[in-house]
Amino acid sequence: MSRNFLNEDFGSEEEDDDFNPAPAEDSDEEDVKPQSTSRGRINEEEEDDDHADVKPERADREGSEDDVKEDIDADEADAGGERDEGEDEEEGENDEDDEDDEEEGEEEEEDEDDEDEDEDEDEQDVSSGRPRKRRKRLGGVHNFIDTEAGVDEEEDEAEDEEDEMEFGAEMHPDDLDALPAGADTDDRRHRQLDRQRELEASMDAEKQAQLLKERYGRNRAAATDAVVVPKRLLLPSVDDPSIWGVRCKAGKEREVVFAIQKRIEERPPGSRKPIRIISAFERGGAMSGYIYVEARRQADVMEALEDMSNVYPRTKMILVPVREMPDLLRVQKSEELNPGGWVRIKRGKYQGDLAQIEEVDTNGLDVTVRLVPRLDYGLNEDSGAPVVDIKRKRPGMASGGPRPPQRLFSEAEAKKRHGKYLSATSGLGGKSWSYLGETYIDGFLIKDMKVQHLITKNVNPRLEEVTMFARGSDDGTSNLDLASLAETLKNSTAEESYLPGDPVEVFRGEQQGLVGRTTSTRGDIVTLQVTEGELAGQMIEAPVKSLRKRFREGDHVKVIGGSRYQDELGMVVQVKDDTVTLLSDMSMQEITVFSKDLRLSAETGVDGKLGMFDVHDLVQLDASTVACVVKVDRESLRVLDQNGSIRTVLPSQIANKITPRRDAVATDRNGAEIRIGDTVRELYGDQRSGVILHIYRSFLFLHNKAQAENSGIVVVRTTNVVTVSAKGGRSTGPDLTKMNPALMRSGIPGASMGPPKSFGHDRLIGKTVQVRKGPYKGLVGIVKDSTDVQARVELHSRNKLVTIPKDVLIVKDPVTGQTLDMSRKGGQRVPYGASAAPPSGWSGGRTPMAAADSSRTPAWGGASSARTPAWAGISGSRTPAWKMDGSRTSNPYDGSRTAYGGAGSRTPAWNAGARTPYDSGSGSSGFDAFAAGSRTPAWGGANAGGRTPAWSASSSAGSGNRDSRGYDAPNPGGAYSAPTPGAYTAPTPGASAPTPGAWADSAPTPGVFNAPTPGGLSGRPYDAPTPAMGGAAATPGAGAYGDGEDGGPRYDEGTPSP
């Protein structure tokens, strides 16, 4: 070895400076054999010997490898053999050369950054003969064996070559012998990883993000560009797998799909019995009860669903057409729910109620909401009701009781009946209570619900609903989150909210502050024309979410929707952000609504009518209740009834509208008269005052302009008010003239009192009447009730009750339809001794009395000129005249005779056989039986036929006594004459209780033997029954007339007979 060492040429410093690391670059190539500069300095003989010594050892250790591996191993073995021989001098020279090379390598590393890694590898190759003492100082390999041993086996051959070249330089020979064969102990990658981490830690975050974007973003974008495919090519075709609809149990669709997924995991493709379906899904909603399976064949679907519960593959499957597949697989974007948003409840006790989102679970399926509770605190519980198992009750079958109103939770109310179900719970903020298994915080119900049980679209919360959710602050004021409310409303704003011409304002975005008027709307984009600023006259587009309607104080607007004040008209009094406060034209109250629910209105007032009903109308709700209309809505009326209660009724629930009576009068507490239009004040209570609008029995409906509640209408009792001022300056004191009977007498002082008024039951009630004028002219009905001037008539044709004045009614016979005279009471006579007046058989027919000549109507007797009609003597003022003219209408003694005697104008006249009903011969004073058979009807006897009514001959018939003429044939029959039928037979009606009587102390109706209607046997000269018999005037009558010359009716000769 000494000879070889001496003969070796170490070169000069210039050659060291010209170190060329080119062979190191070729070491990465597998086909090129690496060359070492240090090995080139050894002669070929020595190199051949080294190779010969190492080959058997490598054959035993690693087996056959490629040529590059063998050369590298041989060099390492040669270096180890030299160290074993103990050639210290050669090691010293090599050590010096290595140190020089390392210094040169460090300089090269600083100058050439691109070749840093290759130079480092060459230096390690040259320094393979480093002394063990120095290698010990560098540390062992135990820190790197566990992490690198299993990694390098998977590297390529070039990396293995580099590691083996470094192995001898980095490892001590003793450590090298302890390693297993093929172990890799390189720590270069660890040091490289450490350097990379230090570089990233010192790198700026923005620069690091830029590097990541360049590294990954470019690749992703390139991949996207390469996969652009027209959508029409993605549509399914007949070559794609088919989709089959399979029936399943409703509500179990998701469970069936999960069961299919589990079965696919148990029997994956490639197993003994794989599941050959491609996919399975369900749609729910309207398509519940079916699952959809994608497969090539129907047999694959049946095999996959065999023996699976809740699904029925044996039933008829539905093959989805190819053109319907895209609709079946189209996925709609779910509504994003955020805390603070507004939703509505779909079902249950809180159906339709507004709720605020408190929290949304990470899965997006469960939501915690805040509700205004509906609790009755056990007030509607029925302790005697049967116990019902809640679990067995069908869903949606709630209790039949009314739904409690919305109000905040009250622990005081809950303690009254359900104290055992109430408990306080600890919370982070506010009062928290647990009641009947529910949690209440600050009076609100906190409830967990599924998203499918909520309405998330078109919620349209009203301002009055949101006001209930206002949170109270420490200073007592309520805080309302209008921002979240406005955001919810913006999401549900439809196109019809903005119409052309609406003034709008942009309140967010780049165009904030622009004011204009809308020209068109397309989806969520509104086109508007700018009216103010530098862009005036230009057309711009803005999203609906950035717009709000713009109003000024004093504008007259109309509420168009989204609020319970819909169709209200009013004037804007305040504008604040999205809310507008206006003064209603109808109720004169301030209401607050959103600007999106308003629109400029050209109307200056409010119609206030719903059909035939208007504000302040008096209506009849039922038989005993009336009310005054205080507000008219679109479909209902708000009324204030006589008891002071406010009701909401439909027009169909109102019986009728009461027409106000201008002459209605009542008395106040002091007895003074009060009428419509008077101003009164309440004496006790709230001491309200107002103008009388309606008077109904003992109730007054007042109108107070200073009161906004109920449109200024109040109801009071007449006994609780006093008059403040009368309409037109009328005296408010009691009417004294009506309180003095002497001043109420009519006629000349000293004259007799007029006929008394009728009291008690009105004779008109129950009569059949006909209306002779007015809107109901010609209609017939029955009088059900009446007052002094009006009557309540039930019309036959309309089957309804109407109020009609009495003066337009005519009493009709319900059978014949003839008009009846109700002005005369007639009829009943007063028996002898029953009255202070002189007894008379005809006393019942006197009008009004028989004592004084001047008061008789018609008057008679003497020569008084006050008789109407006058008679006696040769006076020509009789109306109508009588004696020889035949047109006399009444007789001074029995004035109901109609036309007889004298002239040919007698009605009816008779002579010979035409006489009706009896007697013959004008001027005959005796009884005339006349043998003619023309009497109608005559009755038995030699000369008589069917007299009507029958009569009887009497010895006194021919006497001049007026009473004796009572047996001549009056109408109806006279005394002892036969009624119809037959004489002396049973009358119709009988004689036991006639009304009125035929003679003194009796009054048959009509009587047997003496049954006039009315009439009697008395010969009292002043009696004048209508009609009468005996001495009275019949129609045609019988008896003595005039001055007694005549014993019966006179008949002129020559009267034709029938």
UniProtKB/Swiss-Prot annotation:
Cellular localisation: Nucleus
Pfam families with a match to the protein in the record: CTD, KOW1_SPT5, KOW2_Spt5, KOW4_SPT5, KOW5_SPT5, KOWx_SPT5, Spt5-NGN, Spt5_N
GO BP terms: mRNA processing; regulation of DNA-templated transcription elongation; regulation of transcription by RNA polymerase II; transcription elongation by RNA polymerase II; transcription elongation-coupled chromatin remodeling
Keywords, ordered alphabetically: mRNA processing, Nucleus, Transcription
Location of the region described as Disordered in the Swiss-Prot/TrEMBL record: 1-202, 818-923, 940-1058
Compositional bias per record (Basic and acidic residues), positions renumbered to this chain: 52-62, 185-202, 1047-1058
Biased composition (Acidic residues): 10-31, 63-125, 149-167
Organism domain of life: Eukaryota
GO cellular component: DSIF complex
Family as reported in the entry's similarity comment: Belongs to the SPT5 family.
Cited function: The spt4-spt5 complex mediates both activation and inhibition of transcription elongation, and plays a role in pre-mRNA processing. This complex seems to be important for the stability of the RNA polymerase II elongation machinery on the chromatin template but not for the inherent ability of this machinery to translocate down the gene.
UniProt name for this protein: Transcription elongation factor spt5
The organism of origin for this protein: Aspergillus fumigatus (strain ATCC MYA-4609 / CBS 101355 / FGSC A1100 / Af293) (Neosartorya fumigata)
